[in-house]
Amino acid sequence: MNQFIEKDATELAKENYREYGLYVAQGRAYPQLIDGCKSVYKRVIYGMWQRDTGKIVKVSDLAAQALPYHPHPTSISGVIVQLGDGGNKLKLMDTQGNWGDSSKKIEASADRYIGGKISALAKKLFCEAIEYCPTIKGEIDRDEPEALPAYLPLCFINGSSGIPSGLPTLNIPTLDIIGMIDYYIDILTHKDLKYKPKKFPKPNLEINIHSSVDEWNHILETGKGSLKTGPIMSMENNIITITGLPASKNVDHVRKIIEKEILLDKLDLRDEKKRELCIVI
């Protein structure tokens, strides 16, 4: 009896690649809504939480705390620096030294010069209702949390981006914290599951929204759509001053947009940042 099933190789490749793309998206590229964390962020936070002594420790030591739970050691230190980034709205780490600020294109110092620990806010933000599963390494005597349930969705407050394989790129803008809290209170005070809150939380005030209110509400209701954003800028005496940029954008993105004009000496760009963003064109 023939044990083989004939199948078109092209269709088989499409199916397998689609499954692989979903695995990458769900396991690594996209954050979970229950805690707003990608898998590596969850493991880093959990490792710091479990081994917290209350003292500031070097990034290499923080990475060692997460290593038992994550299979890719080279990515852990970079994730820790992102968690301690000065541009985050919610501070999940207490830091010491120059941790940089990605929104202002300020790079962090080398790992050996900076230290940190899990913040008091992070300890309060994540609740204790945790379900455990075997680690990806399959160690018998060690489990990891399936998720770190959070009282507020981090991916909507600190923002998030993900580039999966064969699926749409995800970019979540940072939302206003007070608006998020009001939104959840509004939901919790109504028992009707079909109840729609009076207003959705707006993006933070560091960007301009070019989409209409109806488009924004549709995105939040359905989870689908594109949000058009732009910088906050002013113009006076032929000088453009930019004081706010959309999530994941920085001065280098602005420079690339006007690179041709800069090379032709038609425009000049100066990054006048100190602590706050200020790009002058």
Task: Go through the PLM ranges and name each one.
Residues 1-222, 280:
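Catalytic phosphate-handling regions of large nucleic-acid enzymes and associated NTPases
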Residues 193-281:
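Charged, surface-exposed alpha-helical interface/stalk elements
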